[in-house]
């Protein structure tokens, strides 16, 4: 499959089955995703693999962040969650927004690679990504922020056909205005 075919056929999978890529399979895709554009090669990102009981720890942290008791079931919707973290690096050349863009680029590239490898993926966020309890559950450092999670699992049978309306490039692509 070509890169353009992979991008044009991707979709978000809000429901996935209980199978997930192994750590080794994921690591290979992370290696490839790490090739995104990265000004000054700062690598201002890291990924945290959440499986099994890790998801319950996150569920309790989300519930606490929402002022609820018990555990949120949201992290149990997929057998594997990959937390996407921007790890800001000191740099006079690379502003924080650009470092966050690199981390987001890694996440998006990883989601494309997972989809192309046959896995269902959806990127989930929420206000609790900025909550201190959720940050602590992930072991985030002072220079880090959570951007969200890739929920990863098997693609349910019979759900492959999902057509998005074709994008009109003229709505989003223009030329710079001519000097007058």
Q: Where do the PLM segments sit?
A:
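Helix-biased detector of long, well-ordered alpha-helical tracts
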Residues: 69, 85-93, 176-179
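Generic beta-strand structural signal
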Residues: 80, 117, 146-148
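C-terminal helix-cap and adjacent tail motif
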Residues: 5-12, 17, 146-180
């Amino acid at each position: 499959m070509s890169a353009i075919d992979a991008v044009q056929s991707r979709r978000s999978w809000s429901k996935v089955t209980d199978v997930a890529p192994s750590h080794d399979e994921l690591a290979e895709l992370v290696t490839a995703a790490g090739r995104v554009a990265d000004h000054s090669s700062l690598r201002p990102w890291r990924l945290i693999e959440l499986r099994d009981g890790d998801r319950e720890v996150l569920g309790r942290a989300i519930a606490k962040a929402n002022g609820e008791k018990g555990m949120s079931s949201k992290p149990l919707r997929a057998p594997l969650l990959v937390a996407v973290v921007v790890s800001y690096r000191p740099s006079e050349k690379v502003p924080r927004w650009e470092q966050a863009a690199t981390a987001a680029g890694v996440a998006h590239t990883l989601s494309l690679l997972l989809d192309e490898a046959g896995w269902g993926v959806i990127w989930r966020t929420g206000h609790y990504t900025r909550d201190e309890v959720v940050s602590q559950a992930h072991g985030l450092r002072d220079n880090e922020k959570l951007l969200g999670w890739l929920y990863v699992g098997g693609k349910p049978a019979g759900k492959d056909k999902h057509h998005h309306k074709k994008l009109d490039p003229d709505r989003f692509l223009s030329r710079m205005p001519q000097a007058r």
